[in-house]
Design a protein with these regions (language model features):
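Hydrophobic alpha-helical membrane context
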Residues: 17-18, 84, 294
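Sec-dependent N-terminal signal peptides of Gram-positive bacterial secreted proteins and lipoproteins
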Residues: 2-29, 403
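Active-site-adjacent loops and short helices of periplasmic peptidoglycan-processing enzymes
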Residues: 22-195
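Domain-terminus/edge residues, biased toward the C-terminal soluble/receptor-binding domains
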Residues: 157-158, 175-403
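A residue-level detector for conformationally permissive "hinge/kink" positions
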Residues: 11-14, 101, 239
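Generic "edge-of-domain/loop-turn" microfeature
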Residues: 17, 21-25, 52, 96, ...
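Short, ordered coil/turn segments that flank beta-strands lining enzyme active or ligand-binding pockets
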Residues: 14, 28, 50-51, 262, ...
Length: 403
């Protein structure tokens, strides 16, 4: 009986915490203001805050288009998740002769490390390297493409189908290889959480040492004009840009994924189907606007309703050590708004031993982020339940069973 009471009380602590937030939701004042979206030339674009997934700007973001070489973000992500950087990649005849366009002139039988290949893929957009990486990771390109599509589904992509690892879209690929700005933002968000990916995409120049087929160093340059003056003499350099990937084919027009960081907030911008130089000018304009008008708030640091005891929380008032707000959770709000104006809603999580529930916040009709409610790891038997009346426990047990 004592064990059941302890388990029940742990659940009640969570329920009381949820109830606390639910009551205070009624006190959140109506907040209607959301900054008006700026104008852009590009027909398809999105700006997403990286830590929350909040969409700040949406212009036809789920419309299907050819991605061109921004495809290689997915290729790089899968390689990093499935391989070590020091693995040796050997270039097949297919990798060398079944690709064209951008590349670094590798030969059949040439060997490079996975790390060197990924720098070539992300900086020089080397198609033969993307093909070789796909063969190495998946065994065959076909298997790797299936991995790409499986990963897209896992990330919640809504309008994506990959048909190759490099983004060239000719013949069959012109209709079978497609994605959208929203999906590319999800893929970019997942990739950016990888430390090695962040290091690669932020690199301006890189040197591949001599190989078994090349006697000299191969010099690589990042084609992202927002972090490295590659062809435009620096007119599109953006001080807050920390990486990205370019793309272009005649079918796709110009595509661009970039990351920018300012004031502890990271934004992801995706541009598709653009006429150059709109991919650069629109990205910079969007970053400037959303950095100027939005701020990031840490939920654990700002959600004070638990500590303030704004309602009688019963067990929670004496037993709050069981649960806490995950310090990794954030929300993003217009700078004119206060944290308390965001309305919280709590849902339970039955899929994890550590995550008990999740708080999601909305503001002016927008989902702006949230945080997990997690167990602190405090054992139930460290808390004295002597102050819990037996009849109260019986009533609570019945209520809990009903739910």
């Amino acid at each position: 009986m004592k064990k059941k009471k302890r388990i029940l009380s742990f659940g009640l602590a969570v329920c009381c915490f949820v109830g606390l937030l639910g009551i205070n939701t009624q006190k959140v004042k109506a907040a209607e203001y959301w900054p008006q979206d700026p104008e852009t030339e590009s027909p398809n674009a999105i700006v997403m805050e990286e830590s929350t997934g909040t969409v700040l700007y949406d212009k036809n973001s789920t419309e299907q288009h050819c991605p061109a070489s921004i495809t290689k973000i997915m290729t790089t992500l899968l390689a990093l998740e499935n391989c070590s950087l020091d693995e040796t990649v050997t270039f097949s005849k297919e990798a060398v002769y079944n690709t064209h366009g951008s590349g670094i002139s590798r030969d059949v039988g040439e060997q490079m490390t996975m790390e060197e290949c990924l720098y070539a893929v992300m900086l020089e957009s080397a198609n033969e390297c993307a093909y070789a990486v796909a063969e190495h990771v998946g065994g065959t390109v076909e298997n790797f493409v299936q991995m790409m599509n499986d990963k897209a589904a896992e990330l919640g992509c809504v309008n994506t189908h990959f048909n190759n690892p490099h983004g060239l879209s000719e013949g069959e690929d012109a209709t079978l290889h497609y994605t959208c700005c929203y999906d590319m933002a999800l893929i970019a968000k997942a990739a950016y959480q990888n430390e090695t990916f962040r290091a690669i995409t932020a690199t301006k120049t890189y040197q591949i040492p001599p190989t078994n087929k090349h006697d000299e160093i191969t010099y690589l340059q990042n084609h992202n004009e927002m972090i490295h003056a590659f062809k435009t003499r620096g007119q599109y350099l953006y001080e807050y840009c920390v990486g990205g990937k370019t793309g272009y084919t005649t079918a796709a027009n110009s595509t661009l994924v970039t990351f920018a960081e300012k004031d502890d907030m990271t934004l992801i911008c995706v541009i598709m189907n653009a006429q150059s130089p709109a991919q650069w000018t629109d990205s910079i304009a969007l970053y400037n606007y959303y950095f100027e008008n939005f701020s990031l708030y840490n939920v654990a640091q700002n959600e004070t309703r638990l500590e303030n005891g704004e309602m009688d929380t019963g067990m929670l008032n004496t037993n709050s050590s069981f649960v806490k707000i995950d310090p990794a959770g954030n929300i993003v709000l217009p700078k004119s708004a206060e944290f308390s104006e965001a309305a919280p809603a709590v849902s339970y999580d039955n899929t994890s031993d550590d995550v008990l529930a999740n708080i999601r916040y909305t503001f002016a009709g927008h989902d702006v982020g949230g945080a997990d409610i997690v167990s602190t790891g405090v054992k139930a038997d460290t808390f004295s339940f002597d102050n819990v009346k037996e009849e109260e426990t019986s009533t609570e047990t019945a209520t809990t069973t009903k739910h």
